[in-house]
């Protein structure tokens, strides 16, 4: 399991520049937006591929739209004043970053031809990236499972998960292709909630299941993820907001609601459940 998590958390690194011994690095790979060296950049081409996959699989979240999102990895990462650009050999295109640090990308053929990167003025390992796919009109403190399934598919296709380890291309191809990663029975794809989590409940009609603790906090509490493996994860500063979901379990329909109880709510999550509804805890995998 630790190997799977490490591979999942390293899936995007094949597109990030790695310095090779004895080979002078391409200056463009290290001196980037506003002079930032070794930036937390992503492949523009792969992110557009993710957008194309979103359109192809839009039926999974028919009323939702796609945005990308920046999240901190380190406690000292400054998330205000981020400058985001698409940068190629000769082209530089500013990207508008919303107040919630989400953004969209426009297709630019010149940027594609120049194999451009999407670059914020922050260093590698300081931030991570995710997709944000949200169906409007859901109850407060809920997400929709189909949206989150699609977030996984698009995020993997776009190469968003950040890491500092070098990864061979074969591992990336296995994760993103042949293994059909997001449809697995025990998918180690980390999601992030808005605030520190107390519990997560899956609800579909009268069926309700509370996620076990090993599916929260990157699985550290019950050994699903070792503390050593956290070095290969992109969740360091947001560990208390992380959770896994049974994405490949099709007994849960796409319209399943994911309900969040937060640490600062001060509510008893069991007390919010109607007595006539059976509640079970998902057993650790």
Label each PLM-derived region with a short phrase.
Residues 130-206, 211-212:
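Short helix-loop boundary/capping segments
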Residues 70-96, 176-225:
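Extended low-complexity, serine/threonine- and proline-enriched intrinsically disordered segments
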Residues 245-285:
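Short, low-complexity, Pro/Ser/Thr/Gly-rich segments in the mature regions of secreted, periplasmic
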Residues 105-127, 236-240, 246-261:
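Noncatalytic modules at the cell exterior or secretory-pathway interfaces
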Residues 75-163:
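Structured domain cores in non-transmembrane regions
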Residues 43-67, 168-192, 255:
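Contiguous beta-strand segments within globular domains
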Residues 15-107:
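N-terminal Sec/ER secretory leader and immediately downstream segment
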Residues 9-11:
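N-terminal signal peptide c-region/cleavage motif recognized by signal peptidases
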């Amino acid at each position: 399991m630790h190997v799977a998590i490490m591979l999942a958390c390293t899936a995007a690194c094949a597109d990030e520049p790695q310095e090779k011994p004895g080979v002078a690095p391409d200056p463009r790979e290290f001196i980037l937006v506003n002079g930032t060296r070794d930036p937390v950049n992503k492949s523009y081409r792969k992110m557009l591929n993710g957008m194309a996959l979103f359109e192809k699989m839009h039926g999974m979240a028919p009323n939702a739209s796609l945005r990308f999102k920046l999240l901190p990895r380190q406690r000292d990462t400054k998330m205000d004043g981020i400058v985001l650009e698409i940068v190629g050999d000769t082209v530089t295109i500013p990207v508008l970053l919303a107040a919630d640090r989400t953004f969209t990308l426009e297709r630019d053929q010149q940027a594609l031809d120049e194999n451009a990167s999407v670059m914020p003025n922050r260093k590698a390992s300081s931030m991570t990236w995710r997709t944000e796919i949200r169906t409007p009109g859901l109850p407060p403190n809920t997400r929709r499972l189909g949206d989150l399934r699609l977030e996984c598919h698009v995020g993997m296709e776009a190469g968003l998960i950040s890491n500092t380890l070098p990864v061979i291309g074969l591992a990336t191809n296995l994760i993103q292709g042949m293994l059909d990663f997001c449809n697995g029975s025990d998918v180690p794809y980390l999601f992030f909630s808005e605030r520190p989590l107390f519990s997560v409940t899956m609800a579909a009609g009268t069926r309700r299941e509370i996620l076990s603790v090993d599916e929260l906090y990157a699985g550290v509490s019950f050994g699903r993820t070792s503390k050593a493996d956290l070095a290969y994860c992109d969740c360091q500063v947001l560990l208390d907001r992380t959770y896994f979901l049974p994405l490949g379990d099709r007994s849960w329909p796409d319209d399943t609601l994911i309900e969040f109880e937060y640490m600062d709510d001060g509510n008893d999550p069991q007390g919010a459940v109607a007595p006539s509804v059976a509640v079970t805890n998902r057993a650790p995998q």
